[in-house]
Amino acid sequence: MMRISLFLLTNLAVMVVFGIVLSLTGIQSSSAAGLMIMAGLFGFGGAFVSLLMSKSMALRSVGGEVIEQPRNETERWLLNTVRQQAQQANITMPQVALYHAPDINAFATGARRDASLVAVSTGLLQNMNRDEAEAVIAHEISHIANGDMVTMTLIQGVVNTFVIFISRILAQLAAGFMSSGRDEGESGNGNPLVYFAVSMVLELVFGVLASIITLWFSRHREFHADAGSARLVGREKMIAALQRLKTSYEPQEASSMMAFCINGRNKTFSELFMSHPPLDKRIEALRSGAYLQ
């Protein structure tokens, strides 16, 4: 319910902004409606295709292998731990995958709660004790139980639509202003080269600004997943796991995977562009119980 409410409120806000832009620019609502439909198709289409293909894309990205039958005691423990925590969280048992990487990391993905995937790096199993590993797995199970992948897709779709629509509207105005020799009543986008160039530049600029919104949500959901892990296995285990992450190698996963991993890159010039909060902030949030209410 919270996810749907957030989606509806975000769409309402976007529609209000669209209305203001149309009023200020004087663009006909009929042409704007067509553009809005096109922007929505592209904006949500790309986001939902990525969601539907997320498991296969993620496995291919890290070279992961789904564990069908455990080959050793460690894989058996991993499957049993995921199964037990999935039952606690009241979700269907996810597929479990293992991938080779020196860093301590894990991620969850999938289009639905009952068709999800939890993947763990070999570095995690080699460098964490069982309590710490349990906490990391519980963190990923919490992402699935919270529906974070779907919510992220909805937000990304709205943001994509907003970026495409506003960029094309402003590009149309710029092209019309810079074109010469047009009749006063002539319709169209003006100079096509100007329209294309301006729209591409604006999509890039607005895309960077829009990423601040999606990355804020990504950081926000990490706090809640940490809290979910604390509820499943205990606060001290999750704190110990986060402290262990401080000693990890810099994550090796592709940039497109960072939002789904427990351990994100911290080498950015601003926290605004981080997919994960700093580890110290996550530990402090657990100790204060800010997200455990």
Curated annotation (Swiss-Prot):
Cofactor binding annotation: Binds 1 zinc ion per subunit.
UniProt KW 4Fe-4S keyword: no
A Pfam family annotated for this UniProt entry: Peptidase_M48
GO biological process, one term: proteolysis
Gene: htpX
NCBIfam families to which the protein is assigned, alphabetical: PRK05457.1
Location(s) in or outside the cell: Cell inner membrane
GO terms under cellular component: plasma membrane
Active site: 140
Transmembrane as UniProt keyword: yes
Cofactor: Zn(2+)
Main location: membrane
Membrane topology classification: Multi-pass membrane protein
Signal peptide annotation: none
GO terms of molecular function: metalloendopeptidase activity; zinc ion binding
PANTHER family listed in its UniProt record: PROTEASE HTPX (PTHR43221:SF1)
Keywords: Cell inner membrane, Cell membrane, Hydrolase, Membrane, Metal-binding, Metalloprotease, Protease, Stress response, Transmembrane, Transmembrane helix, Zinc
EC number: 3.4.24.-
The protein's name: Protease HtpX
Listed HAMAP family: Pept_M48_protease_HtpX
Assigned protein family: Belongs to the peptidase M48B family.
Transmembrane segments: 4-24, 33-53, 158-178, 193-213
Domain of life: Bacteria
Binding site for Zn(2+): 139, 143, 222
Enzyme class, UniProt record, top EC level: hydrolase
